Structures are given as C-alpha cells and as structure tokens.
Amino acid sequence: MDYVIREIKKEEYDLLNDFLYEAIYIPDGVEPPPKSIINCPELQEYVFEFGKRKDDRALVAEVQGNVIGAIWVRIMNDYGHIDNDTPSLAMSVFQKYRGQGIGTSLLQQLLLVEKSFGYSKISLSVQKNNYAVKMYKKAGFLVVDENSEEYIMTINL
C-alpha cells in the first residue's frame, strides 16, 4: 500500500481527537466506550490546544489524500509522564490500515524528528495486552515502570 508520512497541518489538528479515540485499547469482546470519553480531562491532556506548546509535534500517514494514522508528542502530565523534559507519545492508525507497517513508519519518523529537536528520550503508556507493545519493543522502547494494566516505556534517542 502506498502512503505518505508528513507533518500535520494546522487545519488538521482536530483530527487528533479521532486518533485519540482510536488509540484507546479495547480488548476483544469488550464494548467500545462512547466517543465522548475523549472529553475527560486525563485524555484531553493529549490534544487540548494542540500546537500552542513549543514541544507539540505530530506526523500523519496519508493514503490517497486521506489521513489514516497519526503520531504526536507533547510534554504533558499524562499516563506515560516520566519528567518535565521528556515528551510523551500517542499514536494510532485506523483499524483497516493496521498490520501494514504504517505505525512502525510513523514511529520511526517521529523518533528522528524528536532527536533533531534535541530530545534525548520519549515516553509512552500502553496497555499490557495491546498488540502495539511488540512494535514499541521492536523499535527499542524499554519498560521502565508498570502497574496492573499498563507499561510505561521509554526510548533513548
């Protein structure tokens, strides 16, 4: 499949709400939460006023002019927060485009971008049963903390 990875455009920032919802891990057999769940404060931390902080950066994957995946970072007090100097990462790819290497490409490109901005580390939080754990580990992320449901992972750039 042909796709392009590029920087998000300002007029596309609202799409991050859709990708935030897509990033919520839903185990097989579990009813998805209502889309309004993204309005809770702990999830809005990922997208509220995106682009206004100097460390806000996002890339998107595009297929035939349609944005089908997004990855973004910002320094925030989220589930994956480790310190005030380390951006936290969020990402998702629409279901029908998963398993084709698009997420891996988005991740690789964003890590290069963040390194070019002088960051030495990226963090994230991921549900232990999420298939993306394998992708993060393959990319070089290491588990630095965990609770009963999630891993906190970091990668040195």
Range-by-range predicted roles:
Residues 11, 15, 67, 130-131:
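Short alpha-helical
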Residues 24-26, 30, 35-85, 90-94, ...:
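Acetyl-CoA-dependent GNAT
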Residues 137-147:
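Conserved acetyl-CoA-binding loop of GNAT-fold acetyltransferases
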Residues 90, 99-112, 137-138:
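Conserved acetyl-CoA-binding loop-helix of GNAT-fold acetyltransferases
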Residues 8, 91-93, 126:
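Hydrophobic adenine-recognition pocket in adenosine-nucleotide-binding enzymes
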Residues 1-14, 18:
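Conserved N-terminal entry element of GNAT/NAT acetyltransferase domains
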Residues 114-127:
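Conserved GNAT acetyl-CoA-binding A-motif
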Residues 103, 107, 129-132, 149-154:
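Short glycine/proline-centered loop/turn elements that form peptide/ligand docking sites
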